Each structure stands twice: as C-alpha cells, then as structure tokens.
C-alpha cells in the first residue's frame, strides 16, 4: 500500500509504518500537545516524516534524521498526495513549454485546479516557472449563496460562482502542479509586450533570429486572449512579430483572430524543400462540436502561410496589411 511500510526487525517487526509530507512552509516539532511545550525540532515544506501516533489535531512524527515531536495534522498531507504529484510530473515530463513566468507572491502548488484541492509544495515569491497548460476552476464568492435575491436559479448560480484561470507549471526543481494564473507574471519580452493592445498574453515563442548589424534579434510567435478569466478557450488570437532590419523595429507580419484555441502550441524547424529550413508552428483549434484539429503554419520571413495537409482546405481569411511599430 502506498505510504505504508513494514518496519524491520525488533519490537516493531511487522508493524505498518505510515508516511506523510509537510505541506506547511515550516512547522515546529514539540514535545507535548499541551499549551506549554518545548521545541524538539523544525520541519520544512516537502519534508517526509513517519507518523508514530495521532492525538486529536496533532500527530507525533519522526523525521528522516530521527528527530521526534508533535505537529499539527493540518501541516501534513498523506503519501497519496505526494504520489499524485510524482505521477503528474511524470505525465507532463515532455509537455512543451508555452511560456516562462515569475511568481508574484508565495503560492501553493495544487494537485488539481481549484483553491480547495490538495496541495503540498509552496513556491516562494520570485520563483521561476514554466507554463505548460491552462484550465479553469470555479471560485465561489463568499456569502453569495446566502443572498436569495433572484428566483431564477440560473441567474442565482451565475451570481454565486466565478471561473478562475489556473496554470499547470513546472518549477526549476522539476515539480509540476497547478497555480492560480494571477499569481504568475509571464516573462513576456518588453519589446513585444508593449504591442499587446490590452489583450492577455498566454504563450510566446522565439521562431528564429535575424542578424541586424552586430546583433541577433529574435522573431516571435505570440498567443493572446481577452483580459479576463473563465473563457471557454485557451486563446483566441495569434500574432507573429518580425524584425525589420532596415527600420530596426518590430512589425506584425501575421495576425489571426476568432480562434477557439487549445494549448499546447508547438514550434519547430522544418525542411520545406526549395524554401529551405523554416520555422513552423502548429495551432490546435476546437470546432463547434468540440473536436480539435491542427493547423500548421510556416514563416519565410516576413511571410507567414498555412501549410495544408493533402485534401485540407483553408478557411477564408481576409488579407491584412502589415502593422508597423515604432
């Protein structure tokens, strides 16, 4: 059984050991559960401990170094939660990174999207993370259910709940979990962030680099959405920014709107025969039936075009003049 170990020889032979993990940022171990106690040790977030006994809201534990003491049970999570995080990290091991970001505050890493879901690890303010996926979870407004101002059940339900965006992230230690999206500031390069036009950046990628004098300048694919949580799509617009080496500025080489986009977006370099090796990217979009299809694009700077599979037809998209940014 996960989290349960058989002890070795001696008096404890055959006794099942229960393991747990510290979910609090830090907690003290005490020699008694009474109001007056002595500190026997300190455990930190993520530490593994053995449960020796339980008494009301406390558990007596033994650390890996052999220190024993009482700790509040609310500071612990069972082995099953730890195993869940290990499984999640394994499942998302090869998930393509959609963006990088920095935590705005200390924040908990959840096993599933939602404020009330299990959490184990805590990320410190300023932690660097990689964005993998997006999801939404319902946030119930405190006290909303106690206000029967409408007899319309649908209106009452909408007033009582809000949808929040969550990011699935990987930290620098390889831990994977869900955090509130508003707790992470994406590290969007300033030179393209200024052209977001009030929209929210969801993902960004370097397609390639061009030479301008003695420096290399990146060209970007940026995926955006409306500036609010709870939308039914991960993104609904994409833009490609290319660098004009004559005018030394970014220009919008491609823009597409009204997408029902689904992460992940994937970027690669691909051989296109006579055109040579070019940057390519794939967008995943959902139709009205909920079916997801892939759209491939290639960029032969500064032109971006769809790459149609055999038998595939391109939806009609109105041509757009190139936007210039000063």
Which role fits each region the language model picked out?
Residues 218-231, 277-287:
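Short beta-strand elements that form the blades of beta-propeller/WD-repeat-like
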Residues 31-54, 111-134, 140:
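SH3/SH3-like (including bacterial SH3b) beta-barrel domains
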Residues 29-32, 97-100, 104, 108-112, ...:
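Core beta-strand residues in small-molecule sensory/regulatory alpha/beta domains
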Residues 11-20, 50, 62-101, 144-215, ...:
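Boundary regions of SH3-family modules and the immediately adjacent low-complexity/disordered segments
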Residues 18, 25, 39, 45-47, ...:
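Envelope-exposed proteins and targeting segments
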Residues 254-326:
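Hydrophilic extracytoplasmic domains
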Residues 55, 135, 225-228:
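Residue-level signature of beta-propeller blades and closely related beta-rich strand-turn architectures
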Residues 5-8:
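C-terminal motif of bacterial Sec signal peptides marking the signal peptidase cleavage site
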């Amino acid at each position: 059984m996960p989290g349960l170990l058989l002890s070795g020889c001696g008096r404890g032979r055959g006794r099942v050991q229960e393991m747990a993990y510290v979910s609090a940022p830090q907690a003290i171990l005490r020699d008694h559960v009474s109001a007056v106690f002595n500190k026997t040790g300190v455990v930190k977030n993520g530490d593994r401990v053995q449960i020796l006994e339980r008494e009301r809201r406390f558990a007596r534990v033994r650390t890996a170094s052999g220190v024993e003491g009482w700790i509040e049970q609310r500071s612990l999570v069972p082995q099953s939660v730890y195993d869940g995080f290990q499984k999640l990290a394994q499942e998302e091991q090869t998930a393509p990174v959609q963006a990088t970001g920095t935590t705005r505050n200390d924040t908990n890493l959840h096993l599933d999207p939602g404020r009330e879901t299990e959490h184990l690890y805590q990320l410190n303010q300023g932690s660097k993370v990689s964005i993998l996926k997006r999801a939404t979870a319902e946030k119930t407004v405190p006290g909303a259910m106690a206000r029967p101002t409408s007899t319309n059940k649908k209106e009452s339900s909408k007033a009582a709940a809000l949808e929040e965006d969550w990011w699935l992230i990987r930290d620098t230690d390889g831990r994977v979990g869900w955090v509130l999206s508003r707790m992470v500031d994406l590290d969007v390069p300033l030179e393209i962030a200024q052209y977001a036009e009030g929209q929210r950046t969801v993902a960004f990628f370097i397609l390639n680099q061009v030479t301008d004098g003695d420096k290399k300048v990146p060209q970007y694919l940026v995926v955006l959405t409306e500036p609010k949580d709870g939308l039914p799509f991960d993104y609904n617009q994409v833009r490609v920014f290319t660098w004009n080496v004559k005018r030394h500025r970014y220009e919008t080489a491609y823009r597409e709107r009204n997408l029902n986009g689904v992460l992940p977006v994937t970027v690669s370099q691909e051989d296109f025969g006579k055109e040579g090796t070019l940057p390519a990217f794939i967008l995943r979009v959902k139709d009205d039936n909920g079916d997801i299809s892939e759209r491939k694009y290639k960029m032969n700077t500064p032109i971006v075009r769809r790459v149609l599979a055999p038998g595939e037809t391109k939806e009609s998209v109105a041509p757009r003049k190139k936007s210039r940014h000063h």
